Amino acid sequence: VNWKKILGKIIKVAK
């Protein structure tokens, strides 16, 4: 699992 991609998506959604 690519946590970097998941975290990036979460950060984009959070913003």
Curated annotation (Swiss-Prot):
Post-translational modification: The C-terminal amidation is required for full activity.
Organismal lineage: Eukaryota, Metazoa, Ecdysozoa, Arthropoda, Hexapoda
Function summary: Antimicrobial peptide which assumes an amphiphilic alpha-helix conformation upon contact with membranes. Insertion into membranes involves Trp-3. Penetrates into cells once membrane has been permeated. Active against Gram-negative bacteria E.coli (MIC=1.4 uM), P.aeruginosa (MIC=14.4 uM) and Gram-positive bacteria S.aureus (MIC=9.0 uM) and B.subtilis (MIC=0.7 uM). Has cytotoxic but no hemolytic activity. Binds DNA in vitro.
Predominant subcellular localization, coarse grouping: secreted
Outcome (variant: G8P): Reduced antimicrobial activity
Coiled coil: none
UniProt subcellular location: Secreted
Tissue: Expressed by the venom gland.
Record protein name field: Lasioglossin-2
Similarity comment: Belongs to the lasioglossin-like family.
One MF term in the entry's GO annotations: DNA binding
Keyword Protein biosynthesis: no
Chain positions found as Lysine amide: K15
Cystine pairs: none
GO biological process: defense response to bacterium
Gene Ontology CC, one term: extracellular region
Key words of the record: Amidation, Antibiotic, Antimicrobial, DNA-binding, Secreted
